[in-house]
Amino acid sequence: MKSRNGPLRVGIGGPVGSGKTALTEKLCKAMRDDYSVAVVTNDIYTTEDAEALVRMQALPSDRIVGVETGGCPHTAIREDATINLQAIAGLNERFPDLDVVFIESGGDNLAATFSPDLADITIYVISVCQGEEIPRKGGPGITRSDLLVINKKDLAPHVGADLEVMDRDATRMRASRPFVFSDMKRGDGINSIVSFLREQGGL
C-alpha cells in the first residue's frame, strides 16, 4: 500500500478535551488489520497521550512515538515541524512498509493548523461540550481542515447544544468541505472517517 512518497500523513488537531486521542485510538484499531499504521503524539512537557494509546492497546508500543514540544504546541506542527518529521522518519526506518502515520497535535486553539510539509490530510476535532457556537466561530481548523469531526454528540442534551444549529453553522462555515458528527466513546462515526481517509488518501 505504501506509495513512493512514503506513508499517508494524517494530522489530527483540536482543542484540549475534544477527543483527539480517542479518535486516534479508534482509527488505529479500525485500520491496523488492513494497513501498516503508526502514531506520533505531541504533548508540551510529557508523552502522556502516547502512553495512553499504549494502555488502550491501539498499536504495539514500538509504533507509537511521543514528542515533547515545549512551549506552544502549534509551533511543532506548523512553523517548525522538524521534531515531528524526525519522529516520522524514525518510524519509517523501523517500518519500511508503513502506510499511514497519524500525527496528533497537542491541545490548542481554533487557529492551529498543520504545515503542508507535515500532514497530507488534516482532521480537526471539536466537542459539542465546548458550545454549539464553536462551528460558527471559525478559525483555520474549522474552515480549512479536510475533515471536521464534531465529537461527543451524545452529550448535546446535557450541555444545551443544538446539533441542528451546529450542523447548519458547520455547513455554512465549511462550504463544500465535509464534516461528521461522532461519539468516539462508542465508536459512532468512525466508519465514515475511515472511508474518508481511504478515499482522500488513496489507500
Curated annotation (Swiss-Prot):
BP terms from Gene Ontology: urea catabolic process
Entry-linked CDD domains: UreG
Principal location class: cytoplasm
Residues annotated to bind GTP: G14, P15, V16, G17, S18, G19, K20, T21
InterPro entries: CobW/HypB/UreG_nucleotide-bd, P-loop_NTPase, UreG
Localization in the cell: Cytoplasm
Gene3D superfamilies: P-loop containing nucleotide triphosphate hydrolases
Coiled-coil blocks: none
UniProt keywords, alphabetically: Chaperone, Cytoplasm, GTP-binding, Nickel insertion, Nucleotide-binding
Subunit structure as annotated in this protein's UniProt entry: Homodimer. UreD, UreF and UreG form a complex that acts as a GTP-hydrolysis-dependent molecular chaperone, activating the urease apoprotein by helping to assemble the nickel containing metallocenter of UreC. The UreE protein probably delivers the nickel.
NCBIfam families for the chain: ureG (TIGR00101)
Annotated function: Facilitates the functional incorporation of the urease nickel metallocenter. This process requires GTP hydrolysis, probably effectuated by UreG.
Protein name: Urease accessory protein UreG
Organism: Rhizobium etli (strain CIAT 652)
